[in-house]
Structure formats: C-alpha cells, structure tokens
Amino acid sequence: MSKDTIANILTSIRNADMNKKRTVRIPYTNITENILKILLREGFIENMRKHQESNNLFFVLTLRHRRKRNRKGPDKTVLNLKRISRPGLRIYSNYQRIPRILGGMGIVILSTSRGIMTDREARLEGIGGEILCYIW
C-alpha cells in the first residue's frame, strides 16, 4: 500500500468490482469516511459499515454490481473511478471551471475549505477546491 489513501480506496474498489467481489475492506481514515459517505449517498456502493479487528478500524463495503447489457461477450462493469489530483501534481479548480462528467451523470469529488463534497454541492455553494477524483 502506498501513502496515497485516496488512490488506495479507488484501486481497492475498482479491483473488487472488476473481479466481481461483493465486499471489500478499506482501512479507516477521516478522508476515507467522507469519500465513502459520498459514494453511498450517490448510489455507487450499496452499504458501508465500520468494523474493528484488534485495534485496527476498517470499513467493509458492499458493492453495487451494475453490468452493461445488450453486448456480446463478457459483461463489463459500469463503475469507473479515476484519481485526478495526486501528491506529485495537485489540481485545483474554482467553482465555475469544475468539469462535468458525462454531462452530469458522473460526479467529481472535491476537497474544499468546507470539507469533501461533490461537484454539484460545490457549485451550489459557489466554492472551488482540489479535484480528488472522477467517478462515473
């Protein structure tokens, strides 16, 4: 595991989704908790619970499996997660230039002065911040 906790979250969820796993364990941090609450609220994950095992806190996520239909060949997952701002290259945006993912179908997760929030919430409040990731 690397020091980039957000990349670890996204990679764990992406790998579990690609391997058709129903649950995934993610180490607990405050940033992790805020991002997972957004994913739960937006419907990208089905359930989230906190679990403790010998002084180690972690989240157990239940993934929502949505598959593309009407395609020949194996099913592809619909969940896509992409890390944007990273420790070596921070990406910031004001509220007017926050990108729209798939015309508003996806979400952008931002870290603002008022906490971690989605692109829609940031536009409504009129604040920008660091673009953490895209999810569609």
Curated annotation (Swiss-Prot):
In terms of superkingdom, the source organism counts as Eukaryota
Compartments reported by the entry: Plastid, Chloroplast
Q: Which UniProt keywords apply?
A: Chloroplast, Plastid, Ribonucleoprotein, Ribosomal protein, RNA-binding, rRNA-binding
Alphabetically, the GO molecular function entries are:
rRNA binding; structural constituent of ribosome
InterPro entries associated with the record? Ribosomal_uS8 (IPR000630), Ribosomal_uS8_CS (IPR047863), Ribosomal_uS8_sf (IPR035987)
**Cellular component terms per the entry's GO annotation:** chloroplast; ribonucleoprotein complex; ribosome
| GO terms under biological process | translation
- Any one Pfam family here would be Ribosomal_S8
User: What's this protein's function?
Assistant: One of the primary rRNA binding proteins, it binds directly to 16S rRNA central domain where it helps coordinate assembly of the platform of the 30S subunit.
Assembly information from the UniProt record: Part of the 30S ribosomal subunit.
PANTHER family from the UniProt entry = 40S RIBOSOMAL PROTEIN S15A (PTHR11758)
Query: So what family is this one in?
Result: Belongs to the universal ribosomal protein uS8 family.
> Which named protein is this?
Small ribosomal subunit protein uS8c
